[in-house]
């Protein structure tokens, strides 16, 4: 048994014909080939749809440790789809992932993903179900002929860093304590309801005293 994490180093006493029970991994090269062939078969099967699958939203990682990073999420919220003017049932049929459980907790995330949906919709080549009778929103014959299968990720997420010029640190910035401010902000958010309730009760008591 291989040592796992920070535990005691094992000293196994092998008996019982242990050579027969050795786990081998000689099937890995064949597995690699099998996975590759499966990917190619899927790409042929879903063509001309993108190989990478449906469009995913831009989300922030959870917790204070990772919330500065953005990555691809599971699916767009119903609020984002509504703002972009796309029906939630139609969205899945045109290559947009939908996750009804996710919630928008900031207007910034909502605007970013709505814009992403609009850009995707403008670039999308939608094949008509009946070539003889195309519906509203379907692409023209010329656009359909131009269509090729996308091999990379659909609208890859670009992480942009704003470069700032070097400058002197001000006295105000030197005095600023980021950790204490974050703790205070969290405490204020946590105690908001209790403080509001106490203030309301105090105001009611003042009114009663004046009577």
UniProtKB/Swiss-Prot annotation:
Pfam families: Ribosomal_L13e. GO terms for cellular component: cytosolic large ribosomal subunit. It is found in: Cytoplasm. One of its GO terms (biological process) is translation. Its main location: cytoplasm. Component of the 60S large ribosomal subunit (LSU). Belongs to the eukaryotic ribosomal protein eL13 family. HAMAP family: Ribosomal_eL13. This is Large ribosomal subunit protein eL13. It comes from Ictalurus punctatus.
